[in-house]
């Protein structure tokens, strides 16, 4: 006999429900006006979603605030000491594999040191208008459009 009819809002048993992962990311800016740029990073080829572009950041550890997590991640990934600015936006995204992520994006205008590439394939400063030219993670695509269109920052 076939399985009983399943309501559409009930999860399929074959798709594992994964816990929501909370992460933080930095929108690091330099310059002013039309010449301002934003810092972006490309994942290494061997990583999950390899060679996709993203903003630097990472997971929030237990007992850590979002701002503490972002400052720690920027030190670990880029060797910079950043002053974490205001929260710009929060995005929730569910990937095709069932993984769900909540990303808090913070503005960073002030930091000490020059970014050092500790974990990425490549890193660069991009004009806002060029952001759609890069192959970003799907969770970032709405933000990328808003930044390129001048709707944020």
Language model segments and positions:
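Conserved N-terminal beta-strand and adjoining loop/helix that marks the start
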Residues: 3-39, 59
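Short secondary-structure boundary/capping segments
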Residues: 18, 45-46, 95-98, 114-117
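Conserved Nudix-box catalytic region and its N-terminal flanking loop in Nudix hydrolases
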Residues: 35-77
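Active-site-adjacent beta-strand/loop module that shapes the phosphate/pyrophosphate-binding cleft
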Residues: 81-82, 89-114, 122-124
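NUDIX/MutT-family hydrolases
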Residues: 107-109, 115-147
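Generic C-terminal helix-cap and adjacent flexible tail
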Residues: 148-153
């Amino acid at each position: 006999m076939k399985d009983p009819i399943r309501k559409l809002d009930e999860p399929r048993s074959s798709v594992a429900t994964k816990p929501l992962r909370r992460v933080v990311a930095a929108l690091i800016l330099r310059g002013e006006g039309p010449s301002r740029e934003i810092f972006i990073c490309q994942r290494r080829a061997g990583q999950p979603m390899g060679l996709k572009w993203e903003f630097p950041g990472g997971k929030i550890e237990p007992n850590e605030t979002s701002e503490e997590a972002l400052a720690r991640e920027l030190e670990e990934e880029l060797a910079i000491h950043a002053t974490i600015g205001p929260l710009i936006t929060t995005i929730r995204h569910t990937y095709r594999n069932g993984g769900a992520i909540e990303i808090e994006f913070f503005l960073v205008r002030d930091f000490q040191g020059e970014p050092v590439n500790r974990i990425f394939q490549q890193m660069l400063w991009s004009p806002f208008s060029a952001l759609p030219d890069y192959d970003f993670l799907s969770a970032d695509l709405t933000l990328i459009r808003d930044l390129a269109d001048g709707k944020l920052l």
